[in-house]
């Protein structure tokens, strides 16, 4: 069996920044540091931060007064920001800047009196945060659609004053079809010049397609609640390549590789490389050879840290 590695894979700039915000807050202010929702959707990362003194909560009413709270990479609604400000909580915002870009778009549509359609998955924290940017007090509304069926059934107040945005971690192929359906049904609809799916999501989806084309089975390292990791598994499966979403080497089953010659490995944007290395080691213990990295797009994007948490140069 030969191992092939997707490129790029694993951490993106937004995830790097979010994790570093929690780490730096722990170093500068000491534990406990409260984090609203898992800072990124990865079990290994969250447990490591919890051991270091991060306390993960789902709502601000679980946060005591006079403590530091961090908003997760997925972003929060304006109502959550207002609640934090009203309580005087010291907040560091780990929202991915590419999610913030979508928030700004939604807020602008709301101010302009345009209704907004969000393409995304119900219940995902990024979707909840993005929908919470729309101020419906001026009579408009924001709608959530997941697929073409939702578009066909959608009823809006004014189809001539309508715009769309998208969750950043969706399947590019699925989203393209939904956008086409929206433009067919609502010819006057506005939106971003390109969909809001982030560069890292696009790059990892392109890479997993290449991997699935060249391999007999694909392993996606990522947690079950990671949207972008699930999309990678689905993309490989759509190319008729068996694919498995795993948290790490402990989830591997030897029977998956019976008769397999080429094993592809990728990782979601919130999965650290140490987990990939653990998977490679286990496969090599079962007789796999090599770990050849495919050619792919170079990523050199970085996002700045909050001023108080920046490492000071000497």
Swiss-Prot record:
Annotated catalytic residues: 126 (proton donor)
Cofactor note: Binds 1 [4Fe-4S] cluster per subunit.
UniProt: (2E)-4-hydroxy-3-methylbut-2-enyl diphosphate binding residues: 41, 74, 124, 168, 226-228, 270
EC category name: oxidoreductase
Gene3D superfamilies: 3.40.50.11270, 4-hydroxy-3-methylbut-2-enyl diphosphate reductase, catalytic domain (3.40.1010.20)
Pathway: Isoprenoid biosynthesis; dimethylallyl diphosphate biosynthesis; dimethylallyl diphosphate from (2E)-4-hydroxy-3-methylbutenyl diphosphate: step 1/1; Isoprenoid biosynthesis; isopentenyl diphosphate biosynthesis via DXP pathway; isopentenyl diphosphate from 1-deoxy-D-xylulose 5-phosphate: step 6/6
Binding site for [4Fe-4S] cluster: 12, 96, 198
E.C. number(s) listed in UniProt: 1.17.7.4
CDD domains assigned to the protein according to its UniProt record, in alphabetical order: lytB_ispH
This protein's UniProt keywords: 4Fe-4S, Iron, Iron-sulfur, Isoprene biosynthesis, Metal-binding, Oxidoreductase
GO molecular function: 4 iron, 4 sulfur cluster binding; 4-hydroxy-3-methylbut-2-enyl diphosphate reductase activity; metal ion binding
Binding site for isopentenyl diphosphate: 41, 74, 124, 226-228, 270
One BP annotation, GO: isopentenyl diphosphate biosynthetic process, methylerythritol 4-phosphate pathway
Annotated InterPro entries: LytB/IspH
Required cofactor(s): [4Fe-4S] cluster
Intrachain disulfide bonds: none
Reactions this protein catalyses: isopentenyl diphosphate + 2 oxidized [2Fe-2S]-[ferredoxin] + H2O = (2E)-4-hydroxy-3-methylbut-2-enyl diphosphate + 2 reduced [2Fe-2S]-[ferredoxin] + 2 H(+); dimethylallyl diphosphate + 2 oxidized [2Fe-2S]-[ferredoxin] + H2O = (2E)-4-hydroxy-3-methylbut-2-enyl diphosphate + 2 reduced [2Fe-2S]-[ferredoxin] + 2 H(+)
Residue positions binding dimethylallyl diphosphate: 41, 74, 124, 226-228, 270
Function of the protein: Catalyzes the conversion of 1-hydroxy-2-methyl-2-(E)-butenyl 4-diphosphate (HMBPP) into a mixture of isopentenyl diphosphate (IPP) and dimethylallyl diphosphate (DMAPP). Acts in the terminal step of the DOXP/MEP pathway for isoprenoid precursor biosynthesis.
NCBIfam families: ispH_lytB (TIGR00216), PRK01045.1-2 (NF002188), PRK01045.1-4 (NF002190)
PANTHER family with a match to the protein in the record: 4-HYDROXY-3-METHYLBUT-2-ENYL DIPHOSPHATE REDUCTASE
Family: Belongs to the IspH family.
Protein name: 4-hydroxy-3-methylbut-2-enyl diphosphate reductase
Organism encoding this protein: Pseudomonas fluorescens (strain Pf0-1)
Gene for this chain: ispH
